[in-house]
């Protein structure tokens, strides 16, 4: 009995050490997951964006929230987390499951979920180690309003294929800005 318990404790310690040693550095696995998410979003394209030019819309992407200069690391991570959470919510709707290939959508859910877990572990460590305040409420609110505008647009367009295509392209744009923010954070370290 003592040997299995000791082995279990050793595994717990090693597991904690590997996940707690991230030092909130947005791990390489998160970066790879981010890249895979972008590839999945690109693969999800069903129709040409050019055939949907009449449906283009300015969602007023909150670019200032992604500039990264005014952020503390924990605040930036909270903004990244919010973008991924809102993207997950957007593509988890019943209307989304009708619009997209189910196999690709399942892969997208998996990637987004893993990124959320990576960021949550990072946020928890930042609180545990530094006691840093995690959220800039204005930034989080700006991201939420951005996604509300996207949801309203989809509703107004009755979740048409072109509306979803415009939204898919917009989400790719937001993920590109998120990636740029991550890179700036890494360079600051």
Swiss-Prot record:
It comes from Homo sapiens. The lineage of its organism: Eukaryota, Metazoa, Chordata, Craniata, Vertebrata. GO terms for biological process: adaptive immune response; B cell activation involved in immune response; cellular response to virus; defense response to virus; humoral immune response; natural killer cell activation involved in immune response; response to exogenous dsRNA; T cell activation involved in immune response. CDD domains: IFab (cd00095). GO terms for cellular component: extracellular region; extracellular space. PROSITE patterns: INTERFERON_A_B_D. One of its GO terms (molecular function) is cytokine activity. Pfam families: Interferon (PF00143). The gene is IFNA6. Disulfide bonds join 24-122, 52-162. Belongs to the alpha/beta interferon family. InterPro entries: 4_helix_cytokine-like_core, Interferon_alpha/beta/delta. Residues 1-20 form the signal peptide. Keywords: Antiviral defense, Cytokine, Disulfide bond, Secreted, Signal. The keyword Signal applies. The keyword Glycoprotein does not apply. This is Interferon alpha-6. Produced by macrophages, IFN-alpha have antiviral activities. Interferon stimulates the production of two enzymes: a protein kinase and an oligoadenylate synthetase. It is found in: Secreted.
């Amino acid at each position: 009995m003592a040997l299995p318990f000791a082995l279990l404790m050793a595994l717990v310690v090693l597991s904690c050490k590997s996940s707690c040693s991230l030092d909130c550095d947005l791990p390489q696995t998160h970066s790879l997951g981010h890249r895979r998410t972008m590839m999945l979003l690109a693969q999800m394209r069903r129709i040409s964006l050019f055939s949907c030019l009449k449906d283009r819309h300015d969602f007023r992407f909150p670019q200032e929230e992604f500039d990264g200069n005014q952020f503390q690391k924990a605040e930036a991570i909270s903004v990244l987390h919010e973008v991924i959470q809102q993207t997950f919510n957007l593509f988890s709707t019943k209307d989304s499951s009708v619009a997209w290939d189910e196999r690709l959508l399942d892969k997208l859910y998996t990637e987004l979920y893993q990124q959320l877990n990576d960021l949550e572990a990072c946020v928890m460590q930042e609180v545990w180690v530094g006691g840093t305040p995690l959220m800039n409420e204005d930034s989080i609110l700006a991201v939420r309003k951005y996604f509300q505008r996207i949801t309203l647009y989809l509703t107004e367009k009755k979740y048409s294929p072109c509306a979803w295509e415009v939204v898919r392209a917009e989400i790719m744009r937001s993920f590109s800005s998120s990636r740029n923010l991550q890179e700036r954070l890494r360079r600051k370290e």
